Amino acid sequence: MADIRLDIAPDLIHNGVPQRLSDTIILNNRPTITLLSHFNNLFHELNIVKAPHVASSQTTINLYIRFHLLTRLHHRLQTVETSTLPNITQFKDHIRSFFQNEHQPIFQTLTNNDLSEEFVGVTTFGLSLFATSKLDAEQIERVQIETLTEGNITLKPFSADGLEVILDDSYIGVVGKIPGLEVHKFLDKCCREVPAQMGILTDEVKLLMRTGKLRIDGGYDFNCPASTTDVTHYGGYDQFSRQMFERLNLFYNISLSIIPVSALKTVHLFEKELSVLDADKSLLEQTWSAVASFVETWQVKSKVKADDPDEYEMTSLSTLRTNYDGTSTSSPFTDKKFIDWYIKTFSKTEKGSSLRRNELEEKSASSISTTVKKVKIHFSVQYFDDFKVNGHEKSIVVQTHKGEMSLDYYRKIGEVLSAIWKRGKSLAVPCFDYIKLGVEKAFHLAPVIMKKYNLTIDDIINFIDKGPSYLAKLDKIDDCSLISKLIITSVLPNIIQRVYKTDPSNNVMNSVIISRANNLLKSDRDRVLKKALSANVSSSNTSSHEHTQKIVLNKVTR
Protein backbone atom coordinates (compact mmCIF):
# COMPACT_ATOMS: atom_id res chain seq x y z
CA MET A 1 0.00 0.00 0.00
CA ALA A 2 1.33 3.44 -0.90
CA ASP A 3 2.13 5.87 1.88
CA ILE A 4 -0.40 8.63 2.38
CA ARG A 5 0.98 12.09 3.12
CA LEU A 6 -1.09 15.08 4.13
CA ASP A 7 0.50 18.51 3.75
CA ILE A 8 -1.14 21.35 5.67
CA ALA A 9 -0.27 24.72 4.17
CA PRO A 10 1.16 26.95 6.92
CA ASP A 11 -0.88 29.93 5.81
CA LEU A 12 -4.08 28.02 6.56
CA ILE A 13 -3.11 27.81 10.22
CA HIS A 14 -4.26 31.21 11.46
CA ASN A 15 -6.00 32.76 14.42
CA GLY A 16 -9.41 32.84 12.77
CA VAL A 17 -11.68 35.79 12.22
CA PRO A 18 -10.70 38.64 14.56
CA GLN A 19 -13.34 39.48 17.12
CA ARG A 20 -13.91 42.88 18.70
CA LEU A 21 -12.36 43.19 22.13
CA SER A 22 -13.00 46.91 22.55
CA ASP A 23 -15.48 49.51 21.44
CA THR A 24 -13.57 51.43 18.79
CA ILE A 25 -10.57 49.38 17.66
CA ILE A 26 -10.36 45.70 16.72
CA LEU A 27 -7.88 44.01 18.99
CA ASN A 28 -6.08 40.77 18.31
CA ASN A 29 -2.72 39.15 18.92
CA ARG A 30 0.14 40.07 16.64
CA PRO A 31 0.25 38.19 13.34
CA THR A 32 1.87 34.78 13.66
CA ILE A 33 2.37 34.18 9.92
CA THR A 34 4.62 36.99 8.73
CA LEU A 35 6.25 37.96 5.46
CA LEU A 36 9.57 36.62 6.72
CA SER A 37 8.02 33.26 7.56
CA HIS A 38 6.97 32.94 3.90
CA PHE A 39 10.59 33.47 2.82
CA ASN A 40 11.88 30.95 5.34
CA ASN A 41 9.25 28.37 4.45
CA LEU A 42 9.91 28.66 0.72
CA PHE A 43 13.53 27.54 1.08
CA HIS A 44 13.10 25.20 4.03
CA GLU A 45 15.10 22.00 3.66
CA LEU A 46 11.94 19.88 3.46
CA ASN A 47 10.52 22.01 0.63
CA ILE A 48 13.42 22.06 -1.84
CA VAL A 49 15.28 19.72 -4.18
CA LYS A 50 18.97 20.55 -4.67
CA ALA A 51 20.58 20.28 -8.11
CA PRO A 52 24.30 21.13 -7.71
CA HIS A 53 26.52 21.73 -10.75
CA VAL A 54 30.30 21.66 -11.05
CA ALA A 55 30.32 24.72 -13.27
CA SER A 56 27.39 27.09 -13.20
CA SER A 57 26.40 30.49 -14.51
CA GLN A 58 23.84 33.05 -13.46
CA THR A 59 21.15 31.18 -15.44
CA THR A 60 21.96 27.69 -14.15
CA ILE A 61 19.20 25.95 -12.18
CA ASN A 62 20.68 25.05 -8.80
CA LEU A 63 17.52 24.50 -6.78
CA TYR A 64 13.87 23.49 -7.14
CA ILE A 65 11.21 25.08 -4.93
CA ARG A 66 7.55 24.18 -4.46
CA PHE A 67 5.18 25.96 -6.82
CA HIS A 68 2.36 26.41 -4.28
CA LEU A 69 4.72 28.04 -1.75
CA LEU A 70 5.95 30.47 -4.39
CA THR A 71 2.30 31.27 -5.19
CA ARG A 72 1.63 32.16 -1.56
CA LEU A 73 4.71 34.35 -1.35
CA HIS A 74 3.58 36.10 -4.53
CA HIS A 75 0.14 36.83 -3.05
CA ARG A 76 1.68 38.02 0.21
CA LEU A 77 4.07 40.40 -1.52
CA GLN A 78 1.16 42.05 -3.35
CA THR A 79 -0.05 43.40 0.00
CA VAL A 80 3.30 44.90 1.02
CA GLU A 81 4.62 48.33 0.05
CA THR A 82 8.26 47.79 -1.05
CA SER A 83 9.04 50.82 -3.22
CA THR A 84 11.76 52.11 -0.86
CA LEU A 85 13.60 48.75 -0.84
CA PRO A 86 15.11 48.01 -4.28
CA ASN A 87 16.09 44.35 -3.81
CA ILE A 88 12.73 43.02 -2.66
CA THR A 89 10.98 45.29 -5.18
CA GLN A 90 13.01 43.70 -7.99
CA PHE A 91 12.32 40.24 -6.57
CA LYS A 92 8.60 41.06 -6.36
CA ASP A 93 8.55 42.27 -10.00
CA HIS A 94 10.27 39.10 -11.25
CA ILE A 95 7.77 36.87 -9.41
CA ARG A 96 4.88 38.85 -10.89
CA SER A 97 6.40 38.49 -14.38
CA PHE A 98 6.73 34.74 -13.88
CA PHE A 99 3.05 34.34 -13.00
CA GLN A 100 2.10 36.50 -15.98
CA ASN A 101 4.19 34.26 -18.27
CA GLU A 102 6.59 37.11 -19.04
CA HIS A 103 10.35 36.76 -19.40
CA GLN A 104 12.37 37.03 -16.18
CA PRO A 105 15.81 35.72 -15.11
CA ILE A 106 14.92 33.90 -11.87
CA PHE A 107 12.42 31.07 -12.35
CA GLN A 108 12.14 28.38 -14.99
CA THR A 109 9.19 26.07 -15.50
CA LEU A 110 10.15 22.44 -15.88
CA THR A 111 8.95 20.46 -18.90
CA ASN A 112 8.68 16.71 -19.50
CA ASN A 113 9.54 16.00 -15.90
CA ASP A 114 7.74 14.35 -13.01
CA LEU A 115 8.44 17.46 -10.92
CA SER A 116 6.98 19.90 -13.45
CA GLU A 117 3.63 20.42 -11.72
CA GLU A 118 4.97 20.57 -8.18
CA PHE A 119 8.33 22.36 -8.44
CA VAL A 120 9.84 25.43 -10.10
CA GLY A 121 13.52 25.83 -10.90
CA VAL A 122 15.50 28.77 -9.43
CA THR A 123 18.60 30.16 -11.11
CA THR A 124 21.86 31.16 -9.42
CA PHE A 125 20.93 34.83 -9.89
CA GLY A 126 17.56 34.14 -8.31
CA LEU A 127 19.18 32.64 -5.22
CA SER A 128 21.41 35.67 -4.71
CA LEU A 129 18.48 38.06 -5.21
CA PHE A 130 16.46 36.00 -2.74
CA ALA A 131 19.17 36.41 -0.09
CA THR A 132 19.19 40.21 -0.40
CA SER A 133 15.39 40.35 -0.58
CA LYS A 134 15.16 38.42 2.68
CA LEU A 135 17.18 41.17 4.36
CA ASP A 136 14.63 43.68 3.05
CA ALA A 137 11.83 41.49 4.42
CA GLU A 138 13.47 41.63 7.85
CA GLN A 139 13.55 45.43 7.56
CA ILE A 140 9.85 45.50 6.65
CA GLU A 141 9.01 43.43 9.71
CA ARG A 142 11.03 45.73 11.96
CA VAL A 143 9.03 48.67 10.63
CA GLN A 144 5.80 46.79 11.17
CA ILE A 145 6.69 45.99 14.77
CA GLU A 146 7.54 49.66 15.34
CA THR A 147 4.23 50.66 13.77
CA LEU A 148 2.28 48.24 15.95
CA THR A 149 4.09 49.49 19.03
CA GLU A 150 3.40 53.09 18.06
CA GLY A 151 -0.24 52.13 17.59
CA ASN A 152 -0.52 51.05 21.19
CA ILE A 153 0.55 54.54 22.22
CA THR A 154 -1.17 56.68 19.59
CA LEU A 155 -4.49 54.84 19.81
CA LYS A 156 -4.28 54.26 23.56
CA PRO A 157 -7.57 56.06 24.33
CA PHE A 158 -9.42 53.81 21.91
CA SER A 159 -7.92 50.40 22.70
CA ALA A 160 -7.53 47.99 25.59
CA ASP A 161 -4.40 47.50 27.68
CA GLY A 162 -1.94 44.79 26.76
CA LEU A 163 -3.33 44.01 23.32
CA GLU A 164 -2.15 44.77 19.82
CA VAL A 165 -4.10 47.00 17.44
CA ILE A 166 -5.54 45.76 14.16
CA LEU A 167 -7.57 48.33 12.26
CA ASP A 168 -10.53 47.61 10.01
CA ASP A 169 -11.13 49.48 6.77
CA SER A 170 -14.88 49.58 7.48
CA TYR A 171 -14.46 52.17 10.20
CA ILE A 172 -11.21 53.97 9.44
CA GLY A 173 -13.46 56.96 8.84
CA VAL A 174 -14.82 56.72 12.38
CA VAL A 175 -11.36 56.88 13.93
CA GLY A 176 -10.31 59.52 11.42
CA LYS A 177 -12.89 61.92 12.83
CA ILE A 178 -10.99 62.01 16.10
CA PRO A 179 -9.13 65.32 16.33
CA GLY A 180 -5.40 65.20 16.66
CA LEU A 181 -2.54 65.29 14.18
CA GLU A 182 -0.86 62.18 15.61
CA VAL A 183 -3.91 60.00 15.02
CA HIS A 184 -4.22 61.06 11.38
CA LYS A 185 -0.49 60.68 10.76
CA PHE A 186 -0.56 57.20 12.22
CA LEU A 187 -3.57 56.13 10.15
CA ASP A 188 -1.80 57.30 7.00
CA LYS A 189 1.28 55.35 8.07
CA CYS A 190 -0.77 52.19 8.58
CA CYS A 191 -2.36 52.50 5.14
CA ARG A 192 1.05 53.01 3.58
CA GLU A 193 3.21 50.47 5.44
CA VAL A 194 1.12 47.61 6.81
CA PRO A 195 -2.29 47.44 5.12
CA ALA A 196 -2.53 43.65 5.10
CA GLN A 197 -1.26 43.29 8.66
CA MET A 198 -3.87 45.73 9.95
CA GLY A 199 -6.82 44.81 7.78
CA ILE A 200 -6.85 47.97 5.67
CA LEU A 201 -8.15 47.21 2.20
CA THR A 202 -5.85 48.71 -0.40
CA ASP A 203 -6.70 48.24 -4.07
CA GLU A 204 -4.26 45.32 -4.28
CA VAL A 205 -5.78 43.61 -1.25
CA LYS A 206 -9.32 44.13 -2.57
CA LEU A 207 -8.34 42.49 -5.87
CA LEU A 208 -6.85 39.47 -4.11
CA MET A 209 -9.93 39.26 -1.92
CA ARG A 210 -12.29 39.26 -4.90
CA THR A 211 -10.28 36.55 -6.64
CA GLY A 212 -10.26 34.42 -3.50
CA LYS A 213 -6.48 34.39 -3.25
CA LEU A 214 -6.10 36.20 0.05
CA ARG A 215 -7.52 34.59 3.15
CA ILE A 216 -4.19 34.18 4.88
CA ASP A 217 -1.61 35.80 7.14
CA GLY A 218 -1.66 37.40 10.50
CA GLY A 219 -4.83 35.81 11.75
CA TYR A 220 -6.89 38.08 9.52
CA ASP A 221 -9.33 36.51 7.07
CA PHE A 222 -10.19 39.01 4.34
CA ASN A 223 -12.92 36.74 2.98
CA CYS A 224 -15.04 37.10 6.11
CA PRO A 225 -17.69 39.80 6.65
CA ALA A 226 -16.45 43.02 8.22
CA SER A 227 -16.01 42.35 11.91
CA THR A 228 -17.11 45.82 12.97
CA THR A 229 -20.05 48.00 12.09
CA ASP A 230 -20.99 51.52 13.11
CA VAL A 231 -24.11 51.01 15.17
CA THR A 232 -25.45 54.42 14.15
CA HIS A 233 -26.12 52.93 10.70
CA TYR A 234 -29.14 51.24 12.22
CA GLY A 235 -30.44 54.13 14.32
CA GLY A 236 -32.46 54.13 17.52
CA TYR A 237 -29.72 52.47 19.54
CA ASP A 238 -30.59 54.21 22.82
CA GLN A 239 -34.16 52.99 22.49
CA PHE A 240 -32.86 49.52 21.73
CA SER A 241 -30.69 49.51 24.89
CA ARG A 242 -33.61 50.50 27.06
CA GLN A 243 -35.84 47.93 25.44
CA MET A 244 -33.37 45.22 26.38
CA PHE A 245 -33.12 45.96 30.08
CA GLU A 246 -35.72 48.45 31.27
CA ARG A 247 -38.05 45.72 32.60
CA LEU A 248 -35.43 43.30 33.88
CA ASN A 249 -35.61 44.63 37.44
CA LEU A 250 -39.29 43.76 37.66
CA PHE A 251 -38.20 40.23 38.58
CA TYR A 252 -34.40 39.92 38.66
CA ASN A 253 -33.83 42.14 41.68
CA ILE A 254 -32.54 41.87 45.23
CA SER A 255 -35.95 40.71 46.51
CA LEU A 256 -35.14 37.25 45.14
CA SER A 257 -32.14 37.12 47.49
CA ILE A 258 -33.36 38.53 50.81
CA ILE A 259 -37.18 38.56 50.98
CA PRO A 260 -38.94 35.38 52.19
CA VAL A 261 -41.28 33.89 49.61
CA SER A 262 -44.15 34.32 52.08
CA ALA A 263 -43.88 38.07 51.44
CA LEU A 264 -43.90 37.55 47.66
CA LYS A 265 -47.13 35.60 47.43
CA THR A 266 -49.03 38.56 45.99
CA VAL A 267 -46.16 39.48 43.67
CA HIS A 268 -44.53 36.40 42.14
CA LEU A 269 -46.38 33.34 43.48
CA PHE A 270 -49.82 32.10 44.39
CA GLU A 271 -51.07 31.16 47.84
CA LYS A 272 -51.43 27.47 46.92
CA GLU A 273 -47.79 27.34 45.74
CA LEU A 274 -46.50 28.51 49.11
CA SER A 275 -47.48 25.23 50.79
CA VAL A 276 -44.64 23.23 49.17
CA LEU A 277 -41.95 25.91 49.64
CA ASP A 278 -39.89 27.07 52.63
CA ALA A 279 -41.96 30.14 53.49
CA ASP A 280 -39.23 31.76 55.59
CA LYS A 281 -36.54 31.52 52.90
CA SER A 282 -35.98 33.63 49.80
CA LEU A 283 -36.72 32.32 46.33
CA LEU A 284 -33.03 31.72 45.57
CA GLU A 285 -32.69 29.66 48.77
CA GLN A 286 -35.39 27.17 47.81
CA THR A 287 -34.77 23.55 46.81
CA TRP A 288 -33.61 24.11 43.23
CA SER A 289 -31.88 20.74 42.88
CA ALA A 290 -31.82 17.22 44.27
CA VAL A 291 -29.37 14.32 44.09
CA ALA A 292 -30.03 10.57 43.96
CA SER A 293 -27.27 7.97 44.44
CA PHE A 294 -27.15 4.53 42.85
CA VAL A 295 -24.85 1.54 42.44
CA GLU A 296 -24.87 0.00 38.96
CA THR A 297 -23.34 -3.37 38.09
CA TRP A 298 -22.47 -3.93 34.43
CA GLN A 299 -21.25 -7.17 32.87
CA VAL A 300 -19.78 -8.00 29.46
CA LYS A 301 -22.28 -9.70 27.16
CA SER A 302 -21.47 -13.04 25.58
CA LYS A 303 -19.72 -12.55 22.23
CA VAL A 304 -20.75 -14.15 18.96
CA LYS A 305 -17.18 -13.84 17.67
CA ALA A 306 -14.01 -13.67 19.70
CA ASP A 307 -12.90 -10.40 18.10
CA ASP A 308 -16.23 -8.62 18.63
CA PRO A 309 -15.97 -5.46 20.80
CA ASP A 310 -17.10 -5.68 24.40
CA GLU A 311 -20.73 -4.80 25.04
CA TYR A 312 -22.02 -4.28 28.57
CA GLU A 313 -25.45 -4.87 30.08
CA MET A 314 -26.72 -3.83 33.51
CA THR A 315 -27.18 -6.87 35.72
CA SER A 316 -28.17 -5.18 38.98
CA LEU A 317 -29.15 -1.77 40.34
CA SER A 318 -29.29 -0.51 43.92
CA THR A 319 -30.15 2.76 45.58
CA LEU A 320 -27.46 4.18 47.85
CA ARG A 321 -28.51 6.13 50.94
CA THR A 322 -26.32 7.88 53.49
CA ASN A 323 -27.12 7.22 57.14
CA TYR A 324 -26.93 9.77 59.94
CA ASP A 325 -23.61 8.30 61.12
CA GLY A 326 -22.08 8.78 57.67
CA THR A 327 -22.24 5.15 56.59
CA SER A 328 -23.97 4.08 53.38
CA THR A 329 -26.72 1.53 52.88
CA SER A 330 -27.66 0.05 49.52
CA SER A 331 -31.03 -1.46 48.66
CA PRO A 332 -31.40 -3.43 45.41
CA PHE A 333 -34.18 -2.84 42.90
CA THR A 334 -35.91 -6.02 41.76
CA ASP A 335 -38.61 -4.60 39.47
CA LYS A 336 -37.43 -5.22 35.90
CA LYS A 337 -39.75 -2.52 34.53
CA PHE A 338 -38.18 0.00 36.89
CA ILE A 339 -34.66 -1.01 35.83
CA ASP A 340 -35.59 -0.72 32.15
CA TRP A 341 -37.05 2.75 32.79
CA TYR A 342 -33.93 3.75 34.75
CA ILE A 343 -31.61 2.62 31.94
CA LYS A 344 -33.64 4.49 29.34
CA THR A 345 -33.84 7.69 31.41
CA PHE A 346 -30.63 7.92 33.43
CA SER A 347 -27.90 5.68 31.98
CA LYS A 348 -26.85 8.41 29.54
CA THR A 349 -27.35 12.17 29.64
CA GLU A 350 -27.04 14.40 26.60
CA LYS A 351 -25.37 17.80 26.56
CA GLY A 352 -27.85 20.45 27.66
CA SER A 353 -29.97 17.88 29.51
CA SER A 354 -31.86 18.81 32.68
CA LEU A 355 -29.94 15.98 34.37
CA ARG A 356 -26.29 15.71 35.35
CA ARG A 357 -24.76 12.28 35.81
CA ASN A 358 -21.53 11.77 37.74
CA GLU A 359 -20.08 8.29 38.00
CA LEU A 360 -17.11 6.58 39.63
CA GLU A 361 -16.20 3.33 37.92
CA GLU A 362 -14.58 0.40 39.74
CA LYS A 363 -13.60 -3.05 38.53
CA SER A 364 -15.17 -5.90 40.44
CA ALA A 365 -12.77 -7.87 42.61
CA SER A 366 -14.57 -11.12 41.79
CA SER A 367 -14.67 -10.87 37.99
CA ILE A 368 -12.67 -8.91 35.42
CA SER A 369 -15.72 -8.83 33.12
CA THR A 370 -17.82 -6.99 35.71
CA THR A 371 -17.79 -3.24 36.33
CA VAL A 372 -19.35 -1.47 39.30
CA LYS A 373 -20.36 2.19 38.96
CA LYS A 374 -21.26 4.51 41.81
CA VAL A 375 -23.57 7.06 40.22
CA LYS A 376 -25.01 10.39 41.32
CA ILE A 377 -27.91 11.86 39.34
CA HIS A 378 -28.46 15.61 39.83
CA PHE A 379 -32.03 16.73 39.11
CA SER A 380 -32.80 20.33 38.18
CA VAL A 381 -36.37 21.65 38.22
CA GLN A 382 -36.31 21.63 34.40
CA TYR A 383 -36.34 17.81 34.64
CA PHE A 384 -40.05 18.00 35.41
CA ASP A 385 -40.65 20.00 32.24
CA ASP A 386 -38.72 17.48 30.14
CA PHE A 387 -40.08 14.25 31.66
CA LYS A 388 -43.71 13.44 32.36
CA VAL A 389 -44.97 12.01 35.65
CA ASN A 390 -43.99 8.38 36.05
CA GLY A 391 -45.00 6.01 38.83
CA HIS A 392 -41.41 4.78 39.14
CA GLU A 393 -40.39 8.16 40.62
CA LYS A 394 -41.90 7.04 43.94
CA SER A 395 -39.12 4.43 44.22
CA ILE A 396 -36.28 6.97 43.88
CA VAL A 397 -35.00 8.69 47.02
CA VAL A 398 -33.32 12.07 46.49
CA GLN A 399 -31.21 14.12 48.87
CA THR A 400 -31.91 17.85 49.22
CA HIS A 401 -30.98 20.54 51.72
CA LYS A 402 -34.36 19.79 53.35
CA GLY A 403 -33.40 16.14 53.80
CA GLU A 404 -34.49 12.98 52.00
CA MET A 405 -37.67 12.73 49.96
CA SER A 406 -39.00 10.75 47.05
CA LEU A 407 -38.48 12.08 43.53
CA ASP A 408 -42.25 12.00 43.21
CA TYR A 409 -42.58 14.45 46.12
CA TYR A 410 -39.72 16.62 44.87
CA ARG A 411 -41.59 16.94 41.56
CA LYS A 412 -44.24 19.00 43.41
CA ILE A 413 -41.54 21.44 44.59
CA GLY A 414 -39.71 21.52 41.27
CA GLU A 415 -42.83 22.19 39.21
CA VAL A 416 -43.77 25.14 41.44
CA LEU A 417 -40.27 26.66 41.27
CA SER A 418 -40.15 26.20 37.49
CA ALA A 419 -43.57 27.88 37.13
CA ILE A 420 -42.53 30.84 39.33
CA TRP A 421 -39.35 31.42 37.33
CA LYS A 422 -41.20 31.18 34.01
CA ARG A 423 -43.77 33.76 35.15
CA GLY A 424 -41.05 36.09 36.38
CA LYS A 425 -39.10 35.76 33.15
CA SER A 426 -42.26 36.38 31.12
CA LEU A 427 -42.91 39.54 33.15
CA ALA A 428 -39.36 40.94 32.99
CA VAL A 429 -38.14 39.57 29.66
CA PRO A 430 -40.75 40.07 26.92
CA CYS A 431 -38.14 39.11 24.32
CA PHE A 432 -35.32 36.91 25.59
CA ASP A 433 -33.22 37.55 22.47
CA TYR A 434 -32.93 41.21 23.49
CA ILE A 435 -31.56 40.25 26.89
CA LYS A 436 -29.15 37.80 25.32
CA LEU A 437 -27.84 40.51 23.00
CA GLY A 438 -27.48 42.94 25.87
CA VAL A 439 -25.51 40.54 28.05
CA GLU A 440 -23.28 39.63 25.11
CA LYS A 441 -22.44 43.31 24.66
CA ALA A 442 -20.72 43.19 28.05
CA PHE A 443 -18.32 40.50 26.86
CA HIS A 444 -15.38 42.65 27.97
CA LEU A 445 -16.43 41.76 31.54
CA ALA A 446 -16.07 38.03 30.81
CA PRO A 447 -12.52 37.63 32.23
CA VAL A 448 -13.50 39.36 35.47
CA ILE A 449 -16.69 37.32 35.85
CA MET A 450 -14.76 34.11 35.22
CA LYS A 451 -12.04 35.02 37.70
CA LYS A 452 -14.39 36.11 40.51
CA TYR A 453 -17.33 33.74 40.07
CA ASN A 454 -16.07 30.96 37.75
CA LEU A 455 -18.88 31.82 35.34
CA THR A 456 -19.02 32.57 31.62
CA ILE A 457 -21.27 35.04 29.83
CA ASP A 458 -23.29 32.06 28.58
CA ASP A 459 -23.75 30.94 32.19
CA ILE A 460 -25.28 34.33 33.03
CA ILE A 461 -27.64 34.11 30.05
CA ASN A 462 -28.70 30.59 31.03
CA PHE A 463 -29.26 31.69 34.64
CA ILE A 464 -31.65 34.41 33.45
CA ASP A 465 -33.41 31.83 31.31
CA LYS A 466 -33.52 28.80 33.63
CA GLY A 467 -32.80 30.03 37.13
CA PRO A 468 -30.60 28.59 39.92
CA SER A 469 -31.29 25.04 38.71
CA TYR A 470 -29.01 25.70 35.75
CA LEU A 471 -26.12 26.46 38.11
CA ALA A 472 -26.87 23.31 40.12
CA LYS A 473 -26.12 21.26 36.98
CA LEU A 474 -22.58 22.65 36.67
CA ASP A 475 -19.74 20.61 38.15
CA LYS A 476 -17.79 23.81 38.81
CA ILE A 477 -20.46 25.27 41.13
CA ASP A 478 -20.55 24.08 44.75
CA ASP A 479 -23.18 26.43 46.17
CA CYS A 480 -25.74 27.40 43.53
CA SER A 481 -27.74 29.50 46.03
CA LEU A 482 -24.74 31.70 46.86
CA ILE A 483 -23.71 32.15 43.23
CA SER A 484 -27.33 32.95 42.30
CA LYS A 485 -27.39 35.75 44.88
CA LEU A 486 -24.09 37.14 43.58
CA ILE A 487 -25.44 37.17 40.02
CA ILE A 488 -28.57 39.05 41.10
CA THR A 489 -26.83 41.55 43.40
CA SER A 490 -23.54 42.13 41.57
CA VAL A 491 -23.08 40.62 38.11
CA LEU A 492 -26.36 41.68 36.46
CA PRO A 493 -26.24 45.27 37.81
CA ASN A 494 -22.72 45.65 36.38
CA ILE A 495 -23.80 44.31 33.01
CA ILE A 496 -26.84 46.60 32.90
CA GLN A 497 -24.70 49.59 33.84
CA ARG A 498 -22.35 48.77 30.98
CA VAL A 499 -25.17 48.48 28.43
CA TYR A 500 -26.65 51.81 29.51
CA LYS A 501 -23.26 53.49 29.27
CA THR A 502 -23.52 56.29 26.72
CA ASP A 503 -19.90 57.28 26.11
CA PRO A 504 -18.69 57.52 22.48
CA SER A 505 -17.15 54.05 22.64
CA ASN A 506 -20.64 52.60 22.24
CA ASN A 507 -20.71 53.78 18.62
CA VAL A 508 -19.01 50.66 17.29
CA MET A 509 -19.85 47.08 18.24
CA ASN A 510 -19.46 43.53 17.05
CA SER A 511 -21.25 43.26 13.72
CA VAL A 512 -22.78 39.88 14.59
CA ILE A 513 -24.49 41.38 17.64
CA ILE A 514 -25.59 44.47 15.73
CA SER A 515 -26.90 42.46 12.79
CA ARG A 516 -28.95 40.30 15.13
CA ALA A 517 -30.22 43.38 16.92
CA ASN A 518 -31.20 44.98 13.64
CA ASN A 519 -33.04 41.81 12.60
CA LEU A 520 -34.90 41.73 15.91
CA LEU A 521 -36.01 45.34 15.59
CA LYS A 522 -37.04 44.80 11.98
CA SER A 523 -39.08 41.70 12.88
CA ASP A 524 -40.79 43.69 15.64
CA ARG A 525 -41.70 46.45 13.21
CA ASP A 526 -42.98 43.91 10.68
CA ARG A 527 -45.03 42.17 13.35
CA VAL A 528 -46.61 45.41 14.59
CA LEU A 529 -47.30 46.58 11.05
CA LYS A 530 -48.97 43.28 10.18
CA LYS A 531 -51.05 43.44 13.35
CA ALA A 532 -52.09 47.02 12.62
CA LEU A 533 -53.07 46.24 9.04
CA SER A 534 -55.03 43.20 10.21
CA ALA A 535 -56.87 45.31 12.79
CA ASN A 536 -57.57 47.93 10.14
CA VAL A 537 -59.15 45.39 7.79
CA SER A 538 -61.21 43.89 10.61
CA SER A 539 -62.43 47.31 11.70
CA SER A 540 -63.36 48.24 8.13
CA ASN A 541 -65.55 45.16 7.87
CA THR A 542 -67.50 45.97 11.03
CA SER A 543 -67.79 49.73 10.86
CA SER A 544 -68.51 52.28 8.15
CA HIS A 545 -66.65 55.02 9.98
CA GLU A 546 -63.52 56.14 8.24
CA HIS A 547 -60.34 56.29 10.22
CA THR A 548 -56.67 56.44 9.51
CA GLN A 549 -53.78 54.72 11.12
CA LYS A 550 -50.24 55.90 11.47
CA ILE A 551 -47.38 53.53 12.17
CA VAL A 552 -44.51 55.07 14.14
CA LEU A 553 -41.58 52.72 14.79
CA ASN A 554 -42.92 50.03 17.12
CA LYS A 555 -46.12 51.85 18.13
CA VAL A 556 -49.54 52.10 16.52
CA THR A 557 -51.35 55.40 17.04
CA ARG A 558 -54.84 56.32 15.93
Swiss-Prot record:
Q: Where is this region: Disordered?
A: 539-558
Question: What is the originating organism of this protein?
Answer: Rice black streaked dwarf virus
Q: Name one Pfam family in it.
A: Fiji_64_capsid
InterPro entries attached here? Answer: S10
Q: What is this protein called?
A: Protein S10
Superkingdom in the source lineage:
Viruses
Organism classification: Viruses, Riboviria, Orthornavirae, Duplornaviricota, Resentoviricetes
